[in-house]
Regions:
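Bacterial N-terminal signal peptides that target proteins for export
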Residues: 1-9
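Short, conserved catalytic-motif segment at the N-terminal edge
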Residues: 30-85, 107-112, 116, 153-157, ...
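Short, gly/Ser/Thr-rich active-site loops of penicillin-recognizing serine hydrolases
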Residues: 288-289, 300, 367-391
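Bacterial N-terminal signal peptides
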Residues: 9-18
């Protein structure tokens, strides 16, 4: 297993600095970093016909964004620092953050049973499903909300009769419903609307000024057109639990602020920082992957093979036996934490290593395989480490 060593890459193309940048170093490193990022990204765009991508990197306290291609093939509008992408299931990490925020305020405990907060589910299977199960894909709930469910009343009716195939807490089954219910419960315990609470407590708290559930009219021109794997133009259609599970649109720059906060690099509200750190505790073990509160965690010396397996279709679409950690593993710095996200027309990958203050986000306006995202990101992170050994 090849180690990912500490990255000391020379600062280049500074788009939004977290710390002061050395201009001479920036000039010296520009060709090297921009070249290897492009070499990792261009083949992916060509192979899968991706119209546009934005790649954000954090190295040594500096953030950089590289834009490629177009936001729309119809207009030829280029991807820029203002381009908004759908981030799919990476939205779940924000929902986990809001739930952790509610927890730090004493509004809920992860050991609570879901039916304690959703009265209509009392006497159902949710008497045995904890909030922790919902936030770690260990409830047994299916991946998608059934197509015939169009409102919360229908959702509750469906859930009242639902029965898990395995005992909660024993198998990992990736689920939009699980995190959706956790978000619903978190908002209820905070006596507010989910989207409004997220905007007020999380987005604003992190200084994410270009992150939305519903894209405002003033930003519509910045909203990238998405494309399916077969090149059909598409954007996300709102649905039940969509905001909680996959509904966020944002920029590469805003995502870098979120990654930076997850590595303790921003000066933010203490309660919010504590909540973010709480999402990095490890609760379940599946192969080489430790399941955090939505985030997925690996040793920071993880190899590409293990990282690809952890982000494979098997992990997404099948029930995988898991070992619950008791007690939970506390948050650690010497780990690689990641998450993929997709809608029908967009693809996202986020990975960061807290001990190295190094991270990456890849945003694309086309659906393409997780494997290609992980491989490209790993190549970039590894190259940063290779440069570190020469610094």
């Amino acid at each position: 297993m090849r180690p990912i060593r500490r990255a000391f890459a020379i600062a280049v193309l500074c788009v939004a600095a977290l710390l002061p940048v050395d201009s001479s170093a920036a000039g010296a490193g520009k060709a090297s970093i921009e070249t290897f990022v492009t070499r990792a990204i261009r083949p992916v765009m060509e192979r899968y016909g991706v119209p546009g991508m934005a790649v954000g990197i954090i190295v040594k306290g500096q953030t950089y964004v590289y834009d490629y291609g177009v936001a729309s093939t119809a207009t030829g509008r280029p991807v820029t620092s203002s381009t908004l992408f759908e981030i799919g299931s990476v939205s779940k990490t924000f929902t986990a953050t809001l739930a952790a925020y509610a927890r730090t305020g004493g509004a809920l405990s992860l050991s609570d049973m879901a039916s304690e907060h959703l009265r209509s589910l009392r006497g159902s299977s949710f008497d045995e499903v904890s909030l922790l199960d919902l936030g770690t894909h260990m409830s047994g709930l299916p991946l998608q909300v059934p197509d015939n469910i169009t409102n919360n009343a229908q959702l509750m009716e469906y859930l009242r009769s639902w029965k898990p195939e395995h005992a909660p807490g024993t198998y990992r089954t990736y689920s939009n419903l699980g995190i959706g219910l956790l978000g619903m419960i978190a908002a209820s315990t905070m006596h507010g609307d989910f989207a409004a609470l997220m905007q007020d407590r999380v987005f604003s708290g992190l200084g994410m000024q270009h992150t939305y559930f519903g894209v405002p009219e003033t930003e519509w021109d910045n909203y990238a057109q998405g494309y399916t794997a077969t090149n059909i133009p598409i954007r996300m259609v709102p649905g039940v639990l969509a905001p909680e599970a996959y509904g966020i649109k944002t920029t590469a720059g805003d995502m870098l602020r979120f990654i930076a906060a997850n590595m303790g690099m921003l000066d933010i509200n203490e309660r919010l920082q504590h909540a973010i750190a709480g999402t990095h505790a490890g609760y379940d073990r599946i192969g080489s992957m430790t399941q955090d509160l939505i985030w997925e965690q690996y040793d920071d010396r993880v190899g590409l093979k293990e990282l690809r397996e952890g982000n494979s279709d098997r992990m997404l679409l099948q029930a995988n036996p898991a070992t619950r950690l008791d007690p939970a593993a506390p948050p650690r710095d010497h780990v690689l934490i990641d998450k993929t996200g997709s809608t029908n027309g967009f693809s996202t990958y986020v990975a960061f290593i807290p001990a190295k203050k190094t991270g990456i986000v890849i945003l694309a306006n086309k659906r393409y395989p997780n494997d290609a995202r992980v491989t490209a990101a790993y190549a970039i992170l590894t190259r940063l480490d290779d440069d570190a050994s020469k610094d």
